[in-house]
Amino acid sequence: MKKAVVLLSGGMDSATTLAIARQSGFACYALSIDYGQRHVAELAAAARIGQSLQVSDHQFLKLDLAVLASSVLTDISATVPLHGTSTGIPVTYVPARNTIMLALALAWAEVLGSHDIFIGVTAVDYSGYPDCRRDYIDAFEKMANLATKAGREGMVLTVHAPLIDLPKREIIQCGMELGIDYGLTVSCYQADEAGYACGQCDACHIRRAGFEAADIPDPTCYRNKQIS
C-alpha cells in the first residue's frame, strides 16, 4: 500500500482531507504541529480524528512559531477580531506556517519513502491567506521535486490539495459521505481547552455557514448556548 503524509490540524478541512487520502487507498501517516497556537484544543481534536480514521502513525511535533512568526493565533495577549472586521490578509495569518508545515511533511515523506503529501487548504470560502492558493501549492510541489534526494532520483512527489476548489458546503457533504464525525473537530481560533467555540471569529462563521448551506446540523459545541 502506498504511504502518504497527511497534515492534520484537528479542523474540518484536514479531517476531510485525511478521509479522502484514506479512501484513495493510502496508508496515512498523520502529522500535527503544536506551533504555539492559542487554540491548542485542535491538537486534542487531531488525536481523536487520527484514532477515528485509523492512521498508520501519528506524529505530534512542537515548534513554537510565536518567537519568529507573530500572529494573533500565537499571541494570547492579542485580540482575535470578530467576523467581518478585518480587511486584506487577516491578522490570524501566521507567517510561513503552511510552508514550514509542508517542509516538515516533506522531510517525513522522504524518510518513509512516500511520494504523496496531503494538505487541507481551500481557496474558496477562506479568510484571505496567501498560502491557501493553488499557485502556492504548485510552487511548493515544484520546489520539493527540485530540493530532495527523491526528486533528483526521478521519484516525483505530489502535494495533494483535494479541497482547494471546494466551498465549505461541498467539503462538509464530502466528509459526511466518508463517515467523518465533525463533532470531533475544532475550527475556532479561540476555542477553550475543552474545545468549545466562541461562535464569533471568522473560522466559526465560515464553519457555521458551511453547515447551513449543506443543510446539515452543526455539531459544534459553542460556549454561548444561544449560537447554533
UniProtKB/Swiss-Prot annotation:
Gene3D superfamilies: HUPs
Transmembrane parts of this sequence: none
One function term, GO molecular function aspect: ligase activity, forming carbon-nitrogen bonds
Chain positions recorded as Zn(2+) binding sites: 188, 198, 201, 204
Cofactors that this protein relies on: Zn(2+)
Classification via InterPro entries: QueC (IPR018317), Rossmann-like_a/b/a_fold (IPR014729)
GO aspect biological process, one term: queuosine biosynthetic process
Entry-linked Pfam families: QueC (PF06508)
First-tier enzyme category under EC: ligase
Cofactor note (record): Binds 1 zinc ion per subunit.
Involved pathway(s): Purine metabolism; 7-cyano-7-deazaguanine biosynthesis
Catalytic activity: 7-carboxy-7-deazaguanine + NH4(+) + ATP = 7-cyano-7-deazaguanine + ADP + phosphate + H2O + H(+)
EC number: 6.3.4.20
Residues annotated as binding ATP: 8-18
Keyword Zinc: yes
Keywords on record: ATP-binding, Ligase, Metal-binding, Nucleotide-binding, Queuosine biosynthesis, Zinc
HAMAP family: QueC
Family, similarity comment: Belongs to the QueC family.
Function of the molecule: Catalyzes the ATP-dependent conversion of 7-carboxy-7-deazaguanine (CDG) to 7-cyano-7-deazaguanine (preQ(0)).
Protein name per UniProt: 7-cyano-7-deazaguanine synthase
The gene coding this protein: queC
